[in-house]
């Protein structure tokens, strides 16, 4: 097994003689931070890691400033997988599951039967976009690839793997016509890179560095690998956001909540477990227009 840099990163590459680009992602530290917040069973942790890798790949592919959200829902053992990744490459994720229904070695269709996958882009400026596709693939890689078959003119394929310690992803995408103009040659070139990518095993994907993976797959094709782009875990929760949620209740309801909770309202972030506390003084200050800064404790 190769040593990895001490950061998580995505890395783009292109084929010099065909109209195909690619992206690789390696997540270790951010994946560990997400799993440290919630002790997921191994099959759930694997699915969440794959979805984190997918989100990181998509942020490197889709040009926007804002937030990308991948949300998978089902009526099965895992009713929710959710990952958010900002255009600044800050990542967080969460899963909901019924422990009694999660079995060892379970895959996507075992855990999320009849599920759906929503891809949402929430730009800092402009209109929010959402697309939804059925989780009908054998795994998340196939389901996400199916989404792009339905919604994109350019071919896009995903390979995603996670083992509870490391999450890896590979994306291949056709580019507009430039290097190859003949339609049959263009299709053959696309099938060539996909066929080779399909030979990559989970052990290789999780254990090899990017240069070795690309040499293993495409040593006969001229490929250019670009610089790494760091990615990290960061939760976007804050005391201010929690206070805004409290303010939306109105003064009377907020004061009643303080009374019902023995003098202190606790607001927990579902992603990182950060807890924000608001007492009667905080509530009065909030509705008096005094802001949300206070000496009230917060804790993880």
UniProtKB/Swiss-Prot annotation:
One of its GO terms (cellular component) is cytoplasm. Keywords: Chaperone, Cytoplasm, Disulfide bond, Redox-active center, Zinc. Transmembrane segments: none annotated. InterPro entries: Heat_shock_Hsp33 (IPR000397), Heat_shock_Hsp33_C (IPR016154), Heat_shock_Hsp33_N (IPR016153), Hsp33_helix_hairpin_bin_dom_sf (IPR023212). It is found in: Cytoplasm. Under oxidizing conditions two disulfide bonds are formed involving the reactive cysteines. Under reducing conditions zinc is bound to the reactive cysteines and the protein is inactive. GO terms for molecular function: protein folding chaperone; unfolded protein binding. Its main location: cytoplasm. Disulfide bonds join 235-237, 269-272. One of its GO terms (biological process) is protein refolding. Belongs to the HSP33 family. HAMAP family: HslO. Redox regulated molecular chaperone. Protects both thermally unfolding and oxidatively damaged proteins from irreversible aggregation. Plays an important role in the bacterial defense system toward oxidative stress. This is 33 kDa chaperonin.
């Amino acid at each position: 097994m190769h040593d990895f840099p001490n950061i998580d990163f995505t890395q783009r590459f292109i084929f010099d003689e065909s109209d195909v680009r690619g992206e690789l992602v390696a997540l270790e530290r951010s994946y560990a931070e997400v799993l440290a917040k919630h002790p997921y069973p191994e099959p759930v942790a694997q699915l969440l890691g794959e979805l984190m890798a997918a989100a990181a790949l998509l942020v490197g592919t889709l040009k926007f400033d804002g937030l990308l959200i991948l949300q998978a829902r089902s009526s099965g053992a895992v009713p929710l997988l959710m990952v958010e990744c900002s255009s600044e490459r800050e990542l967080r994720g969460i899963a909901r599951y019924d422990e009694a229904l999660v079995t060892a070695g379970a895959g996507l269709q075992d855990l999320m039967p009849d599920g759906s996958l929503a891809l949402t882009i929430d730009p800092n400026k402009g209109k929010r976009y959402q697309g939804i596709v059925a989780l009908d693939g054998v795994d998340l890689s196939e389901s996400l690839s199916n989404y792009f078959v339905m919604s994109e003119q350019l071919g896009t394929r995903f390979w995603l793997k996670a083992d509870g310690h490391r999450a890896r992803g590979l994306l291949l995408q056709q580019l507009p016509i430039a290097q190859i103009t003949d339609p049959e040659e263009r299709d053959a070139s696309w099938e060539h890179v996909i066929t080779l990518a399909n030979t990559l095993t989970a052990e290789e994907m999780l254990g090899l560095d990017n240069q070795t993976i690309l040499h293993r797959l495409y040593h006969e094709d001229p490929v250019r690998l670009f610089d790494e782009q760091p990615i990290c875990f960061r939760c976007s929760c804050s005391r201010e956001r929690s206070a805004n949620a409290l303010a939306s209740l109105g003064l009377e309801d907020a004061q009643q909540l303080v009374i019902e909770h023995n003098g202190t309202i606790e607001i927990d972030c579902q992603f990182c477990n950060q807890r924000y506390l608001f007492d009667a003084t905080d509530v009065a200050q909030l509705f008096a227009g005094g802001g949300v800064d206070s000496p009230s404790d917060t804790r993880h």
